[in-house]
Structure formats: structure tokens, C-alpha cells
Amino acid sequence: MTLAKIELLKQLLRDNEAKTVLKQTTVDQYNIIRKFNTSRIERNPSLRMKWAMCSNFPLALTKGDMANRIPLEYKGIQLKTNAEDIGTKGQMCSIAAVTWWNTYGPIGDTEGFEKVYESFFLRKMRLDNATWGRITFGPVERVRKRVLLNPLTKEMPPDEASNVIMEILFPKEAGIPRESTWIHRELIKEKREKLKGTMITPIVLAYMLERELVARRRFLPVAGATSAEFIEMLHCLQGENWRQIYHPGGNKLTESRSQSMIVACRKIIRRSIVASNPLELAVEIANKTVIDTEPLKSCLAAIDGGDVACDIIRAALGLKIRQRQRFGRLELKRISGRGFKNDEEILIGNGTIQKIGIWDGEEEFHVRCGECRGILKKSKMRMEKLLINSAKKEDMKDLIILCMVFSQDTRMFQGVRGEINFLNRAGQLLSPMYQLQRYFLNRSNDLFDQWGYEEPPKASELHGINELMNASDYTLKGVVVTKNVIDDFSSTETEKVSITKNLSLIKRTGEVIMGANDVSELESQAQLMITYDTPKMWEMGTTKELVQNTYQWVLKNLVTLKAQFLLGKEDMFQWDAFEAFESIIPQKMAGQYSGFARAVLKQMRDQEVMKTDQFIKLLPFCFSPPKLRRNGEPYQFLRLMLKGGGENFIEVRKGSPLFSYNPQTEVLTICGRMMSLKGKIEDEERNRSMGNAVLAGFLVSGKYDPDLGDFKTIEELEKLKPGEKANILLYQGKPVKVVKRKRYSALSNDISQGIKRQRMTVESMGWALS
């Protein structure tokens, strides 16, 4: 149907007789009937597309120069029609036209393509540099798992990503950035620079940025590696009866944020559980924790998953968590049923009576431990049935033991032979169920001997399992192994849970789904830098981490600390930050180091020779009560040793791997990390009169007054009452009269005034001398 035909039809319709004929004549073209007489949603779009693609010319060309470049035919193959299409008012073309265009079509300006389509070019780079191994044929056990479809630059929630994309592409229209957006300012700046001047439409840029920032996860059947670098090539790597060995090339994009987030959350929980109010402390530390440059809360909101520790901190911060339950390494998701808890006194196998919360009711769960998955059916104090799949022996064994303990089966209680007095990392006694869990994971034979055996089912796809985790013609009672695949259970739904003071997560039904005892005790090194901006957390770190955190804190509070020191306030040494630092000083040496460090600092103040780097270096050592020699003199040291040996020491008169200073550049290097002192070392170090450079709380009121007596020292000034006056030597020994303020003035104001006066004096002296 062309436009010319439509014009003819319009002319015909003006004639009443012709109109009647047209109305009564049937339309015999199915396509026309289909196109103009139905408005329903296609029920089977896939079939419709396949049917359409079978026709000779299924694709429409838009009008324009580009379409005109495609010839009618190429080497005897017809590429497009001459006829005009009624729907698009263009021409229709064949599938071969696409191939012709890709092969012989014009090449436009490709400048900026690599920057815009960076994720695709990185994928090509990984593919170009990949290592391909042999293909093996045979049964492939693929398990449906929730996997990330492609590697990301930085994962964030969709709403946060849309704000970041707006900030990158349309900074003027985006308005004032939210705090959650501003966290990613380095990424925003980098992307703006990269995309500057590209002629590609913003909608394409936005789509590509979304691909780099928003995670797309699907449940896919997978055998082997599940990282995004493998999943993007999954279609080439495995089928139902074949597998291809493959290792992606280039730098593997590991999710460092996720790993560092887990390390941080585990440490926060370990530190919090020893506090009088674990929840309060966990929230305080979590809100002051930064991973790289991003707050921990932002990471927890952006990154899907993590482990138990992450979910506990999420709940503490008021974020939603995935629907799942934990019991140590065992992860569970309820299929059916519900239990009710009642406290009962249970006589266990070692003759002791334990008060334990017993769950009553028939329940069914999906269970998982490592790579071993299964289905558990339990009732009150009985494990009815456990169906598991084949996996590593260690995972199978742990899953079976944990399910037996979780089911609270009477045989499990009777299997206890030794003492149950396990402690957590904080030195606290574990609750009875976690005691039993630890006991049987260490002494599995006690449990299996008590459990008993039976004949396995006769079904061909099932087999028995013995205490050595081998296939057997007898099986542990109620435990069966299936040859079929048990899919990984999905936990896509999120829910809001309440959290107790002791960091236990409770559902609305009152069911405890996980707690601090379920957090893994494995310790690993974070891939990204974690900063805990609270001294309460520092003692959990290594010696180097504690040194770095302490000196960072001193630099941050340098003005206040220096002012207190110059005013002779001895209680200034009693900061929480220094209490944490004391934990890495050998106990026998803490008092001696304190006496030495205090004596050096006092000498600096008395002799009016301020050295800021030395002040920073020695200040943390002053926390402990000072210990002196019998004659009242301090001990002398050239090197201050810290716990851990090796490079863990600080040189008093020179630099060391932990602490060094370059006076030319005014840069401190703490544990390899450079920190500038520019702007923090004022003129007091360049002038003789160090002590009088800062007069916090005093006002210079005039010239020397002989009626007020001799010049006062800093210590004597401190004893003056508000409004009292005194003589003092300022700057280069200039005699002046000062008055103590009646209200306490801001330290920073007095310090800045002191420095300003000092500069003016030095300048005037220079003018006078010239």
C-alpha cells in the first residue's frame, strides 16, 4: 500500500457508489487485516518476530541519504524494495541489507567511542587477551545462581546512579547534589573529563553509564566460576554436555569494595560485642567508618550481599536486608511451616543440664553451606529428613552437622561427651546452641556414632552417605544425597528487621534470624583502605593501622593540642585516642616512654624552641603515668619500640618507616602515607619567643606597667583570675601588659591574633633594622 494508492482511494470514497462497493468487498491480505484491525498486546512476541523475519523484507528503512546508499541488490541478492511502506513511509529491506551495511557501509567519526563504550572495549580487551583451554564433553552439573551479568566500574543503587549520571551529563540542570551523590565526586569528575567534547547523544551516554554503575543480576545455570568476567562469556563456556576452559585477560576487575566492606563490618561487630551497649557502639563506629573515600553506610546500601556481619550492620543503620536466616556457616530460607520457641531444661550427654530455647512445630527449609545445598524438614527435637546434593566433603559434612544441631534432635543432645565451654573472640561464653555447634564441628564422630544408620531409598537418583562423606549402601538416618541438581535458593526479597541491644536480628514474627555469634571469625586484609574515625576502633587494627590513625587524629586536632600544651595543661595527655595507642606500646616500657616524652616536650616549651614534627611524634607516648629513675630524672631513649617487632619503631632524632618528616617540603610520612603540615606550622617556630606566640584567653592591653611587678611565666598567668592584669615578655622579648579575659575566648581566635601580632612585630623589626 503506497501513498499514491491512498490518494486514489480517497478520490473513490468521494463517490457514494464506490464507497458502497469498497465496504462490501472483502480484504484478502492477512497483513493488512492484522495491522489495522487489532490493537491487543502481542501474546507471543518471540513467535511473531520469528514469523516476521521469515518474510523477504521484514525490516523498515527510514527516509534519508543513509537509506539511499543501500543498493536494490548486491551480487544477485535483493537488499530492499522500491515500494513505499505505509507504516514508516520508507522502504522495506531484507536481513542481508544489515550484513551489507556492516561490511560496505560508510564509517563515520569514531572519535570518543572508546570513552563512551568503555565497558564494551574492556570486554573486547579481556577477550583478546584471554586464555582458552580445551573443550571437554560429558555431563555438566549446572546450578542456578544469582550472578552479576557484567563487571561494574562502581556498584550503586539505581536511584543513586541516576543522580550521579545527571551530575555527569547535565551538571547545570542537576541542581544541588545530594550527599549520597557527592560521595562519588571523584568518579563524576573523571567521567566528565573523559566524555567532554563527545558528539554522541546524551541518551546513549546515560545508557552506557548506567551499564557501568547499576548491577544487573539474574538467576542463571552456572558450573564453576561465577565472577562477572566469566558470566559475560557464559554462552561460550558451557552447555548441558560440554565445558570450555577459559581465563579472562587483562586486569581482573575484582570487587574490592565488597571485600573491604565485609572486613570492616566483621571488625566493627567484634569490637562492639565487648561494650556495655553493643548496638550503640556499632552504630557509632559504622557512621564514622570510611572505605577508600566512601562512607560504609553508602557501600552497604549500594552493594548487594556481603555476609552476616554486613546484614547486622545494615540492620543497625536502619537499612533493609535480604530474607534469610543464619546459624553459623549454615544459611537457611523457610519453605513452609512455623515454629514457636519455649525455654526448656535439657539433660545433655555429659550429664549437665542446659536451659535451651526449643522450637516446636513442623518446618521446612532450603539450606546451604558453602557449595553444598539441600532441603531440611524438621519437627520438635527431631530432624525428619535432609536431602543434599554432592559437593566438597568439607561442605557436605558441615551442612549435615549444622542441620542436626539446628534441628535440636534428641540424639544430638545425647552425643555430647566432653565439656562445652567455648568462648568467642571477645572472651565471652557462647550461648548453648552455639556451644553445641562448635563442639560437634570439632568432634563430629561423637554426633555420628550417636545418630545411627539406616538403608538408603531404592530410587536410582538417590544414594546413601556414611560418616566419611562417601557414597554408601547404608546412610546416616534421615540423610539422603541426590544425583540431581538442587538450585541455589533466591533471596531477592528484602525486609525490615528489628535489632536488639546485643546485635540479634529479629523478624516481625519474633524469630531470631541471625546474631553476632554467626559472624565468621576469619580475618583477612582489606583490599581498600578502611578509616575508622573513632579511637574506640583503632585497637582492633594492626600496629601500623593504629599508628596511622593516631597521628591522623593528632594532625586533625593540632591547633587545640598545641594551644593546650603551651598553656601547660598536663591533663591534655589523657585523650581516648592515646589510650588506644598505649595498647601497642610494650607494657614494661609505657611508663618510661611517657616520662621521657613528657620531659622532651616540657624542655621544648621551657626553652621556647617549638618543633611541630617532634611535638606530633612524641605526644601519643605521653598517655601512661610517667615512670622516672630513682634520682627523679627521666629515662633516655633514641628509639621507641612498638609491639610486633620488625619496622614497628619510632626514631626520636631521625626518620623511621613509621614516621618521617621533610622540613623543606613540610610533609610528614606516616606508614608510607604522606600528610602535609603546610599551614599548620606558623611563625612561632621561626621566631625565638615560642611560649608567647599563643595567648589563649588573654588580651594585650598596653605597655609594661612597673606597678604590676615582675614578668610572669605561662604557669603564673594561668593562675590569674578573670580581669586581673600582669606583665609578660612577648615576641622578641617585648614587655607588655596583658589582662585575662572575663569570658573564655575561642582558642582559634586567640591563636590567630597571636600569630598576626607576631608577624607584625617581625616585619616592623625588619623595617627598623634596614
UniProtKB/Swiss-Prot annotation:
Gene Ontology CC terms: host cell nucleus; virion component
Any GO BP: symbiont-mediated suppression of host gene expression
GO molecular function: RNA binding; RNA-directed RNA polymerase activity
Entry keyword set: Cap snatching, Eukaryotic host gene expression shutoff by virus, Eukaryotic host transcription shutoff by virus, Host gene expression shutoff by virus, Host nucleus, Host-virus interaction, Inhibition of host RNA polymerase II by virus, mRNA capping, mRNA processing, Viral transcription, Virion
N-terminal signal peptide: none
Principal subcellular localization: virion
Record-linked Gene3D superfamilies: Polymerase Basic Protein 2, C-terminal domain
Localisation per UniProt entry: Virion; Host nucleus
Superkingdom of origin organism: Viruses
Subunit structure: Influenza RNA polymerase is composed of three subunits: PB1, PB2 and PA. Interacts (via N-terminus) with PB1 (via C-terminus). Interacts with nucleoprotein NP (via N-terminus).
Function: Plays an essential role in transcription initiation and cap-stealing mechanism, in which cellular capped pre-mRNAs are used to generate primers for viral transcription. Recognizes and binds a wide range of cap structures of target pre-RNAs which are subsequently cleaved after 10-13 nucleotides by the viral protein PA. Plays a role in the initiation of the viral genome replication and modulates the activity of the ribonucleoprotein (RNP) complex.
Family indicated by similarity: Belongs to the influenza viruses PB2 family.
Name of the protein: Polymerase basic protein 2
Species of the source: Influenza B virus (strain B/Ann Arbor/1/1966 [cold-adapted])
